[in-house]
Curated annotation (Swiss-Prot):
Part of the 50S ribosomal subunit. Contacts protein L20. This protein binds to 23S rRNA in the presence of protein L20. The lineage of its organism: Bacteria, Bacillati, Bacillota, Bacilli, Bacillales. Belongs to the bacterial ribosomal protein bL21 family. Keywords: Ribonucleoprotein, Ribosomal protein, RNA-binding, rRNA-binding. PANTHER family: 50S RIBOSOMAL PROTEIN L21 (PTHR21349), LARGE RIBOSOMAL SUBUNIT PROTEIN BL21M (PTHR21349:SF0). It comes from the Bacteria. GO terms for cellular component: cytoplasm; ribonucleoprotein complex; ribosome. Coiled coil: none annotated. HAMAP family: Ribosomal_bL21. Residues 79-102 are annotated as: Disordered. Residues 79-91 have a biased composition (Basic residues). This is Large ribosomal subunit protein bL21.
Length: 102
């Protein structure tokens, strides 16, 4: 059984026991989190939401709060001696999917 959930403005396909990385959630490590925006449930019985599946939820456990790999942003204006270099690390949450309730 699998489900498609919406989190952080993105749609993620999840299965039980899977580890996923999502945009940062305001939850402590080790806590349980429930996703209510389930868009699709697949498996033996397929359920398609319009826009979400009624009564469906996905429960996950927070494994880690972290920051992603650093990216460098460099902008310049030619012939003007104008340069700017910035770095950014996107925060993320690592989850383990425990149960899909459909």
């Amino acid at each position: 059984m699998f489900a498609i959930i919406e989190t952080g403005g993105k749609q993620v396909k999840v299965e039980e026991g899977q580890e996923i990385f999502v945009e940062k959630l305001d939850v402590n490590e080790g806590d349980s989190f429930t996703f209510d925006k389930v868009l699709f449930v697949g498996g033996d019985a397929v359920k398609v939401g319009a826009p979400t599946v009624e009564g469906a939820s996905v429960t996950a456990t927070v494994q880690k709060q972290g920051r992603g790999k650093k990216i460098t942003v460099f902008t310049y204006k030619r012939r003007k001696d104008s340069k700017r270099k910035k770095g950014h690390r996107q925060p993320y949450t690592k989850l383990t999917i425990d149960k899909i309730n459909a």
